């Protein structure tokens, strides 16, 4: 657990290690004021395009050889029960647990992004050589556009 203040912004965080929950490091953060993001600095918004096509991260797909066991660890960590499809739902995002789809073992298979225009994303990814099997694929992780 850590806390840091700079200027008018205070950030608090706790990290959950993969050894405890499986699959990924999870960072749970709280900023005051709520729209600040201290970890990126006090002026981070100046570096973000106001016309950006990306709207938000709306989900993550976790893969495992034992998706039910992994899901149970995450349920316990977040204090939330998954539905019958092994999906933990939050107010504006979700975590889906699936079988090991690419034989890389337990971990993040994909991030789900809400975007304004999928075609623009796919064109840019193709131009940059970031597609694999028809998906946007960066650093071993797929990016699924919603």
Spell out what each predicted region is.
Residues 65-69, 116-119:
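A generic structural signal for alpha-helix starts
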Residues 66-81, 124:
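Amphipathic alpha-helical segments
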Residues 1-55, 59, 83, 87-104, ...:
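Vicinal oxygen chelate
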